[in-house]
Amino acid sequence: MSKTKPLSADEISRLEALIGYEFKEKARLDRALTHASARSAAAGNYERLEFLGDRVLGLCVAELLFSTFRNASEGELSVRLNQLVSAESCAAIGDEMGLHNFIRTGSDVKKLTGKAMLNVRADVVESLIATLYLDGGLEASRKFILKYWQGRATSVDAGRRDAKTELQEWAHARFAATPAYRVDDRSGPDHDPSFTVTVEIPGVKPETGVERSKRAAEQVAATRLLEREGVWRKSPTGN
């Protein structure tokens, strides 16, 4: 495993300015930006942090949606939540912040492209949220999440129903058939898996989705098929 230097004092100061929070324990910020390929868990990387950050993000975004869309059904709230906490959304926020300039990775990860690298960028955002939670409590992480997610909460497609439900009704009406979902691949560690799922309807070209849970991957696959067939317009988030 390659040896990676910790973040410098100048880099930490720049990160704190980007985040809008001054950390009590600076080492936590360094760990949040360090991939396992660059440093072991004992030495400090973000593998455990991303697990916690994912849960904190989900809670805060769910709370935001619950208070913002008071007349929305549970299904509508779930559609918004899935879009807002997806790997694509997290990675986009990390890119907007310029976090890729601070991520510590080993040589193996630097060769990654596409979905694999997108997951790394998303994981860093989640680990950063966990670090804020551990250093400053829920209020510190909530403040950060509101800063970057509040505007996006109203920009996702409010009119969309659950993609799987929409696809099933369309398939029944058009082909008298029920969509079938197949898990093609499961990769990655237990704490950060990646699922590849294909949805098939007789007489229709299949579509594939890749996400960090089987359910989310099914939603992505269903969404892509609906968009390709013109049932839905393309999502603003690009999912």
From Swiss-Prot:
Q: What cellular component GO annotations does this protein have?
A: cytoplasm
Q: Which cofactor does it need?
A: Mg(2+)
Taken from the record, one Pfam family name reads: dsrm
Predominant place of localization: cytoplasm
Q: Which residues are in the DRBM domain?
A: 162-231
| Chain's role | Digests double-stranded RNA. Involved in the processing of primary rRNA transcript to yield the immediate precursors to the large and small rRNAs (23S and 16S). Processes some mRNAs, and tRNAs when they are encoded in the rRNA operon. Processes pre-crRNA and tracrRNA of type II CRISPR loci if present in the organism.
Q: How does it assemble?
A: Homodimer.
Name of protein = Ribonuclease 3
Q: Which organism is it from?
A: Agrobacterium fabrum (strain C58 / ATCC 33970)
What is the gene name? rnc
